[in-house]
Regions:
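Glycine-rich anion/phosphate-binding loops
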Residues: 21-23, 53-68, 92-102
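Alpha-helical scaffold segments in soluble metabolic enzymes
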Residues: 7-11, 68, 72, 103
Length: 134
């Protein structure tokens, strides 16, 4: 998604980047300010055909992808600070990305866990979403 990656990020995910550490999602990395407390980090991937079915609604997939990570943080007694998102997509389709991004943004706001960075790539394989939360 080399040339279209910037457009995809600008349209669907930059509006979700509400934390200053996201730096407007112009890079794959985020800047975090440490408070001196321990930082709990977790990562989970969800893969089409393994963790969800090809016809599952994109909003449901988005919520699952984020919530499995938030559950891991909660299990450690951690308060979420943000997450980075990796999407491996066969195609960048509006009909799929719009509800995915909307649901991801709703959950990110509800759990005070903003997107801070990430990556998008194209793949001939199944859809894969990976989130690293902290």
């Amino acid at each position: 998604m080399a040339s279209g990656e910037d457009d995809l990020i600008a349209r669907y995910f930059r509006p979700l980047a509400t934390d200053p550490g996201a730096l407007g999602l112009v890079d794959d990395a985020a800047v975090l300010t440490s408070s001196g407390d321990d930082l709990v980090v977790t990562t989970d991937a969800v893969v089409e055909g393994v963790h969800f079915l090809p016809g599952d609604p994109p909003d449901t997939i988005a919520r699952k992808a984020l919530r499995v990570n938030l559950s891991d943080l909660a299990a450690k007694g951690a308060v979420p600070a943000g997450f980075v998102l990796t999407l491996a997509l066969r195609e960048a389709k509006e009909a799929w990305l719009a509800p995915f991004a909307r649901a991801l943004g709703e959950d990110a706001a509800a759990f005070n866990c903003p997107v801070l960075g990430g990556d998008t790539v194209s793949t001939p394989g199944p859809l894969m979403i990976s989130i690293t939360a902290f």
